[in-house]
Amino acid sequence: MTAIDVGTESEATGNVPPRYACGETFVPKSRYIDPEFLQLELDRLFTQVWQPACREEEIPDPGSYYEYTIGRQSIMVVRQKDGEIKAFYNACTHRGMKVVRGTGCAVGGDLRCEFHGWRYALDGRSSFVPSRDEFLNRPREQWSLRQVAAGTWGGWVFVSMAEDPPELLEWLDPLPTALEPFRLQDMRFRWRKRTMLAANYKTVIDAFIEGYHTPGTHPQTLRPVQGPRPSAEPAPPQEFVYAPYTPTIPYRNHSRFIYTARPDSGDRDSARKEQAARPEVFANSMQYNYLEVGSLVTERDYRAAQQLATMEPSDVPPFVLYHQICEELALAEGVDFPKMSMEQYFAGNGDWHVFPTLVILVEKSCLLGYRMLPDAEDPNRCVFEMFSLEHFAPGEVPETSWLEVERWQDHDGWGELPTQDLKNIDAIHAGMHSRGFEGLWLNTAQEMSIRNEHAIADRFIFGVDGDG
């Protein structure tokens, strides 16, 4: 097989070794399967960027802590007595023992190392060292835990191991402005699940940051006219013309894709447009999301869709009617429902890749999220998290915890649509090891979010500033 020319280090890729050099629309598979590249990511990328460690609700009280692990680095996020949040490397300054494991709350207001009983105040200061006078020549300031930069946005706690990281809101641009009306910080978990996948973490991310795969993987979503649970039989070629158009929008540090009209559609889908104008057809799609995704539509929204399905066509588009009914039901049940114009809605709605590990699909009432974390040593494994957040009425927030399964196949509650993605992922990554596969050739309109993530990574790994 003829090798694919991805450029040379001196021609177009700066300091990027040829083995890892991307073309304009090409990404070599080595960036997904090489242990050496994984180590570069862990050493040069994850040590420099802001990354979501946990949700604020996971550390609700003073003394609450959450252990966030990325590669071999363990970071503890701790709620302070005044409600503020600090983060520290999770290593006792005596012999390196982890001070906390998992989640919990500091007993007596101190963080205690279980090895020799050293203690730290919630702000990281050394508060107790047995036989302190027997330690010689160590300055007092070196006894404290080493702090990690921490900040909050949208209800997430972000951490950065960089010595001088950019301001968090600057790093997140344009998300804070685009998503402000949705008030993500006021959402709470509806459910959350975690498992391990036999794939590189980017293989999994890539499956959730482009919509080009929709007709091939999720053909049932092309058939709302069939009802809330349409057929998932593979789509014939002629049905692909009705696939959603999902152009990607690259930003400096992140990306987004949206659903919109295909520029060249003409009149070929006029029949589909007539179907979409029928309230029950749009309602079927919303009901499907509730029944087979378990997110993007709340239980209230599901009732709104059922109500919409009984209505006759009118001058008001079903999409607008649906949102009106959703808001009316939410307000009637005491939900502090976010207020926004349709312009604001479309500016924030969509599928966001919050580089490097978080993907969120945002609606007014709820959010579907994914987080993918690399394995510390194996580029062919990763942690996969899937969760749903929601705006609840006071007193209605459910108690949740992470449902953890060793193999995703051991849990039958993923829903039809996520299960289709999960079935693909193992096979996608396995195929990357084929001698007949060189790398990813990307759709220039609907898959450039993937190219953008590699351009962002190259800034940190190789010092090359691309066009992202």
Residue ranges of predicted features:
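N-terminal low-complexity, Ser/Thr- and acidic-residue-enriched intrinsically disordered segments
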Residues: 2-5, 28
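Coupling/switch segment of ABC-type P-loop NTPase heads
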Residues: 10-12
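Short, contiguous pre-domain boundary segments
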Residues: 15-29, 185, 395-399
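Non-catalytic accessory segments flanking enzyme active sites
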Residues: 20, 25, 30-76
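Generic structural signal for secondary-structure transition and capping sites
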Residues: 46-50, 97, 213
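Short Pro/Gly-enriched beta-strand edge/turn motifs at strand-loop
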Residues: 48-59, 129-134, 352-356
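Rieske [2Fe-2S] iron-sulfur-binding domain
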Residues: 58-181
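C-terminal catalytic domain of Rieske-type non-heme iron oxygenases
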Residues: 84, 151, 156-468
